[in-house]
Amino acid sequence: EGVVEKLERGVDVADVGCGHGASTVLMAQAFPNSRFVGFDYHAPSIERARKAAEVAGVGVNTRFDVAAAKSYPGTYDLVTFFDCLHDMGDPTGAATHVHGSLKPDGTWMIVEPFAHDHLAANLNPVGRVYYAASTFVCTPASVSQEVGLALGAQPGEARLRKVVTGGGFKRLRRAAETPFNMVLEARP
């Protein structure tokens, strides 16, 4: 709903849980009029992200800072979470922080592994891979953090909706999906 047009004009974007910065760099290359800040709580990942931005030539409109999803600074037109919400110990706390960091007409774009709301519907080849990875990576990562909600990599849209609305958002829609991911758009 107008996000691409805003990015083309130039807006402020926070890419939370950016890891090594691949998503931030791609967006900065695609939308050079916008300003991007990649946030991650892992300092070595932020160092790699800074180097990636330098190599890609997007240092003018991109920066990377160490910050957690519940405490990054600033206000933004767009906040993105690429495959990281389910790894967070307190995803509702992160959603609450996103809500407070968005400008009044801002958008939160959440990309998460595609999953149905019921276990049986996820017992397919892709779902099984996600459940396996979730068992050894996603769920332990979440449990090791404050709150430890442990959504795992297959929470489904209904559980994600509870997290998002628990953070104060009133509007949520599925904007796109593939066999591997779903893209959700949340607005205050």
Q: What is each model feature region?
A:
Residues 12-14, 24-70:
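Class I SAM-dependent methyltransferase SAM/SAH-binding core
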Residues 168-188:
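Core SAM-dependent methyltransferase catalytic element
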Residues 67-79:
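A short acidic, Gly/Pro-enriched loop at the edge of an enzyme's catalytic core
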Residues 1-12, 26:
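Conserved alpha-helix/loop element of class I SAM-dependent methyltransferases that forms part
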Residues 17-21:
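Class I SAM-dependent methyltransferase "Motif I" SAM/SAH-binding loop
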Residues 77-91:
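A short SAM/SAH-binding and catalytic strip from SAM-dependent methyltransferases
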Residues 111-166:
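C-terminal alpha-helical "lid/dimerization" subdomain adjacent to the S-adenosyl-L-methionine
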Residues 92-104:
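A short glycine-rich, Lys/Arg-flanked "PGG" loop and its adjoining helix->strand segment in the class I
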